[in-house]
UniProtKB/Swiss-Prot annotation:
InterPro entries for the chain: Dihydropteroate_synth-like_sf (IPR011005), IspG_bac (IPR016425), IspG_bac-typ (IPR004588), NO2/SO3_Rdtase_4Fe4S_sf (IPR045854)
EC code(s) of this entry: 1.17.7.1
Functional pathway: Isoprenoid biosynthesis; isopentenyl diphosphate biosynthesis via DXP pathway; isopentenyl diphosphate from 1-deoxy-D-xylulose 5-phosphate: step 5/6
GO molecular function, one term: 4-hydroxy-3-methylbut-2-en-1-yl diphosphate synthase activity (ferredoxin)
Function: Converts 2C-methyl-D-erythritol 2,4-cyclodiphosphate (ME-2,4cPP) into 1-hydroxy-2-methyl-2-(E)-butenyl 4-diphosphate.
Keyword Iron-sulfur attached: yes
Cofactor annotation: [4Fe-4S] cluster
Organism this protein belongs to: Gloeothece citriformis (strain PCC 7424)
Cofactor note: Binds 1 [4Fe-4S] cluster.
Name this polypeptide is given: 4-hydroxy-3-methylbut-2-en-1-yl diphosphate synthase (ferredoxin)
UniProt keyword list: 4Fe-4S, Iron, Iron-sulfur, Isoprene biosynthesis, Metal-binding, Oxidoreductase
Amino acid sequence: MQTLDTPLTPTSTPSLFDTTIHRRKTRGVKVGDITIGGGYPVVVQSMINEDTLDIDGSVAAIRRLHEIGCEIVRVTVPSMAHAKALAEIKEKLIKTYKAVPLVADVHHNGMKIALEVAKHVDKVRINPGLYVFEKPRADRTEYTPTEFEEIGEKIRETLKPLVLTLKEQDKAMRIGVNHGSLAERMLFTYGDTPEGMVESALEFIRICESLEFYNIVISLKASRVPVMLAAYRLMVKRMDELGMDYPLHLGVTEAGDGEYGRIKSTAGIGTLLAEGIGDTIRVSLTEAPEKEIPVCYSILQALGLRKTMVEYVACPSCGRTLFNLEEVLHKVREATKHLTGLDIAVMGCIVNGPGEMADADYGYVGKQAGYISLYRGREEIKKVPEDQGVEELINLIKADGRWVDP
């Protein structure tokens, strides 16, 4: 689904009042046949919720996601048995469908699991707070610098084999920090803060860099949007200071479900994307994973970062509206939603209609009772009876050679 053949090159300095989003320059990191960062389109990903030991169920779930536009699919790997199951999943996926970029999610004391699963996936996600898990001590009041360094060295020794394995195979790692699972020593040193999240990520980045491994993607997720925003912004600031250009994976973890879950995810992900921050996104909903993908693409389209569907412009309706706007918009959407790359405006009256739809490819405007005016761009093409409006709009699109059958 990745649509850009060559990376974009910024042509001007961003302005506060620029209507174009200027994305932060990052290095490209390959995950299978998809590139995260490097000027490529923001990548959409999700995670299956099947047990990885269920080979057929996992293959079917991965395929369902990929077929609707999920470009990278993550699977959970809580044990060695799950890690080995990935070999069968990948083999069956290729045999019955095609290769799909896969990510393994590894958590508690997962070094051996990560080494095994690295053979079968394109990227391994580790959680710095859990990869080398130190059981909290109830009587602890501080971490001395010596203790801090000793655990840091243990982390290095544990992480090194995985880094070298991924480096040898030219695969990727996501250093995925979660606000809710920071290591105890980070909590004691920095508190339950965005600073602790950023320092947790930087510790692992430095280990990777010391081993000359740079195929790294970073995430700093939280269930509270303000914490998530602060963590990513601080991460960008620190990386800029240190000369790092790693791509960022955006997400609000545990966003919930329904309308609020979507709004919460959009508030976090959309805000950062609008600032030029972010190279891949995952909307985490307490729903079927397939429900996450349209939300991702809608966020990207609303910001002008990727255009994968029709952009509908429609007024909210008022006393001047000359037809049932909600009903007509529904009819227009149902007739044209399979198209891509078009802007279609449905406006209720002549007062704001032509001006508000000036950037649209096609316009459907109520000018007098019982009749619809159809526009191509700013040009009025014809006036037709209201009951023929949708059909004639389709005919106009067809006449321009921009129609495809659903």
